[in-house]
A protein has these predicted regions:
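Bacterial N-terminal signal peptides
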Residues: 1-8
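N-terminal signal peptide c-region/cleavage motif recognized by signal peptidases
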Residues: 10-12
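Catalytic glycan-binding domains that act on GlcNAc-containing polysaccharides
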Residues: 14-174
């Protein structure tokens, strides 16, 4: 699903009040001093999926994205098996809610399968985001954009898309 489609689906007309209390986004947000809605917004843009064919989209924990295609595993067990098969060929794979890239961030974990644990995945995503904010303390869009890419033509576009999703969700967050 494209980022523009996610931004469209998370419009004022479609958004309803929601709470992140008790979620991994709430827990990690408190631990990392990051707004949980921002973490959720990044996860929504990174792994957003609509498994039930409704108008709702949500971060999905068992997404694996290779350079060729995204894989939406139905279960954690399936995701583990698919990830193991992918890693036999390449470490160019993004994993889980926050789409942590094994090639660039594999050093942060003992085993790539650890990234299928939602809490671990969001914690690593928060660490990456905090590192970006430390590099760009006065430019949130740049810091958020660098979460996804360091290619200048993609950074601002991604950062602005996440910021629009964040701003919309923040207005509806309890």
């Amino acid at each position: 699903m494209s980022l523009s489609m996610i931004a469209l689906m998370v419009s004022h007309e479609n958004a309803e009040a929601f709470s992140l209390k008790g979620t991994v986004f709430d827990q990690v947000g408190q631990e990392a001093n990051i707004d949980p809605v921002l973490l959720y917004s990044i996860a929504l843009c990174e792994s957003g999926f609509n498994p039930s064919s409704t108008k709702m989209v949500a971060p999905y924990p068992w997404v694996l994205r290779t350079p060729n295609k995204p894989i939406y595993a139905q279960t954690e067990k399936e995701a583990r098996a698919r990830l193991s098969a992918i890693l036999k060929k390449s470490n160019a794979v993004d994993v889980g809610l926050m789409q942590i890239n094994v090639r660039w961030h594999g050093h942060r974990i003992k085993n790539a399968e650890d990234l299928l644990d939602p809490l671990t995945n969001v914690r690593i995503g928060a660490d990456i985001l905090n590192e970006n904010f430390a590099r760009h303390p006065h430019d949130a869009i740049q810091a958020i954009g660098n979460y996804h890419s360091f290619q200048s033509d993609r950074v601002r576009s991604y950062g602005l898309t996440v910021w629009r999703v964040f701003s919309t969700l923040k207005a509806w967050h309890d």
